[in-house]
C-alpha cells in the first residue's frame, strides 16, 4: 500500500477504541479546593536540596502568621519525608474522614495541618509510592481536606525539582515561593536551580532565607560560622532575589522540634522580613 493510501481515519478509530476515546489534556490539571473551604493565599517553601531546614522555615512562617492574627494551614507536600506533624506535637495522631472529605489535624495554636504521617498506620513506615501515587496524594490532600476559611496555606514542598515540586507549581495556585538555603559552597548552584524552576513556572520568588547561618556564643555573643561563611549576599546579588534573613543554629529550637513543643517555644522575630514578604 502506498503512503497516500493509508487509512488515517481507521487508525484514529482504532487508537480511540484502545484508549477509550480519552479526552486530550491541553495542559496540567488545576486543583480546586472543595466548596466547604476557602483559601486566600497559597505560598510554597522550597529548597534545591534536602536537609537545609525547609520544614523549619515553613513552621516559623506559619506560627508567626498565626500570631499576627491570620488563619493558617500547612500542606506537607514532602510526601515521602514528612516532618511537620512531629514539630507541632502531632506524632501518633491520625486524621479522619467526614463523608468523602478529610478533617485536618490542628495544632494547639490552631494551625491546620495535612500530612502523609497523619494517614499512615505507623508514622515510621516508609512511603514506597511512585510518581502517580505521590501526585494523587497531593491532589487529595489539597482538594478533599476541609480547610475551612484560610488566609494562608503554606506548602512545605519536597526538596529538589522532581515530580511533586513540578505538580505543586503547575496545579496549585502558588502566589510565590520562599527559598531556603544553607551556608555551603555548592549552595549557589542548588539555589540557582530552584530560582530557575520558579521562573520557568512563572511563580514569583519572594526571597531567600539562609538557615544554619551561624552560632552565637551564649557567654560573649560572638558569632561562629561552623558551616563556613554566609553566601546569602552572593545569592541575592547573582539571582536578584530578596534577602529574607539568616537563621542561627539554636539547639533549643532543634530540641523543641524533636519534642513537639516547637510552636509554643519558638522565639519571636526570627525572620521578620520573610513574614513581611509573605504578607505582601
Where are these regions (language model features)?
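C-terminal lobe/tail of nucleotide-utilizing enzymes
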Residues: 1-30, 195-280
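Phosphate-binding P-loop
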Residues: 34-40
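Residue-level signature of catalytic and energy-coupling elements of molecular machines
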Residues: 39, 50, 76, 84, ...
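Walker A/P-loop phosphate-binding motif and the immediately C-terminal alpha-helix
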Residues: 41-79, 195, 201
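Phosphate-binding loop that captures ATP/GTP phosphates
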Residues: 71-123, 135
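Glycine-rich phosphate-binding loops of nucleotide-dependent enzymes
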Residues: 114, 138, 157, 170, ...
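Phosphate-binding/switch loop-helix module in NTP-utilizing enzymes
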Residues: 120-168
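Conserved Switch II/interswitch segment of TRAFAC-class P-loop GTPases
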Residues: 148-155, 161, 173-194
Amino acid at each position: 500500500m502506498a503512503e497516500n493510501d493509508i487509512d488515517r481515519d481507521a487508525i484514529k478509530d482504532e487508537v480511540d477504541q484502545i484508549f477509550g476515546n480519552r479526552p486530550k489534556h491541553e495542559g496540567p490539571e488545576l486543583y480546586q479546593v472543595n466548596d466547604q473551604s476557602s483559601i486566600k493565599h497559597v505560598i510554597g517553601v522550597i529548597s534545591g536540596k534536602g536537609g537545609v531546614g525547609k520544614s523549619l522555615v515553613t513552621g516559623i512562617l506559619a506560627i508567626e502568621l498565626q500570631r499576627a492574627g491570620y488563619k493558617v494551614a500547612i500542606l506537607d507536600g514532602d510526601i515521602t519525608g514528612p516532618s511537620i506533624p512531629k514539630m507541632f506535637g502531632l506524632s501518633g495522631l491520625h486524621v479522619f474522614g467526614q463523608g468523602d472529605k478529610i478533617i485536618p489535624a490542628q495544632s494547639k495554636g490552631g494551625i491546620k495541618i495535612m500530612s502523609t504521617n497523619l494517614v499512615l498506620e505507623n508514622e515510621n513506615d516508609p512511603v514506597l509510592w511512585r510518581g502517580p501515587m505521590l501526585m494523587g496524594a497531593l491532589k487529595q490532600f489539597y482538594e478533599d481536606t476541609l480547610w475551612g476559611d484560610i488566609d494562608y496555606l503554606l506548602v512545605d514542598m519536597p526538596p529538589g525539582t522532581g515530580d511533586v515540586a513540578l505538580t505543586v507549581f503547575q496545579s496549585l495556585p502558588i502566589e510565590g515561593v520562599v527559598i531556603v538555603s544553607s551556608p555551603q559552597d555548592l549552595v549557589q548552584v542548588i539555589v540557582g536551580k530552584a530560582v530557575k524552576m520558579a521562573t520557568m513556572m512563572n511563580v514569583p520568588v519572594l526571597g531567600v532565607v539562609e538557615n544554619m547561618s551561624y552560632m552565637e556564643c551564649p557567654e560573649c555573643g560572638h558569632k561562629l560560622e561552623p558551616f563556613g561563611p554566609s553566601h546569602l549576599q552572593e545569592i541575592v546579588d547573582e539571582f536578584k532575589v530578596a534577602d529574607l534573613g539568616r537563621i542561627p543554629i539554636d539547639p533549643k529550637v532543634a530540641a523543641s522540634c524533636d519534642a513537639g513543643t516547637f510552636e509554643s517555644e519558638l522565639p519571636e522575630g526570627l525572620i521578620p522580613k520573610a513574614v513581611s514578604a509573605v504578607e505582601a
